[in-house]
């Protein structure tokens, strides 16, 4: 198996490569401007959504306060993004893939305790789930998780050590095998077989999409539902999305980085920025970009887009993120055991 570093070259991104590089370089710097500026440090697949959301919020904020605001974005693997904030990235808000990633920042004192209750729905304004993206016609006839281990399939999925989406991918697969057996040895064997068939392991979800789409590697991409929808929009005749019978409710989280926002004088606008995610306009926009709105009535408006019948485990089924991370993703936990036992070490040519 080959682990790859995150690539900034992405055909399906709305931003040009130059703009992405500019954001990556300036997103965590100082803020000296007459216009209020806040930095949103986010994870890989949200870039298109926030590119659309930011102008919507800027217009709302100008109409409400008479003041202009500029939003700087920074994107990458969720775990790596959290570490960048801990190491000094001047984020005003974080919109990350996992509650656990924000908890890591909280533990440094940068985010106040109780952030999970600061916004509605446990500070999760939109959700997603984990699906399969396959090439048009589904040549390998992949329908469910069993197909990934029973057939000669090359899988693309990112690395849970750096990607929040990859952690959700792992838990989605585990949720499926838990439905089949209570035997922990059988569950682990299933996961080990699945990960032995991962041919490229990128550092982030968008990097894995690039590997699958741009580089034409692998037979199936295990992906966020919203990432699959975005890819099919960009390549309407080339890919199909397969929703497995069992998956997990992936709940990205948002928070104000209180110490930074206080120092930058942006606490008020940062709060407005995250609160606005829960408005009807923003919820519908999230749905347009493939995220499941937390507002149930708006979610039902998009029932033709989202499979609302799939069985979804939640992180609570795993004891919450602290427990799940300790059991599966910490050094020496189950993922490391599986990865360490992968003796194939296959690489794509």
Please identify what each model-predicted range represents:
Residues 32-162, 309:
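N-terminal segment of the mature folded domain
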Residues 261-349:
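Extracellular/periplasmic juxtamembrane helices and adjacent flexible linkers that interface
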Residues 2-16:
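Bacterial N-terminal signal peptides that target proteins for export
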Residues 41-43, 134-136, 153-180, 194-198, ...:
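Short beta-strand->loop
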Residues 180-245:
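Ligand-binding pocket segment of bilobal, Venus flytrap-like solute-binding proteins
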Residues 124-131, 191-195, 202-203, 234-267, ...:
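Periplasmic-binding protein-like
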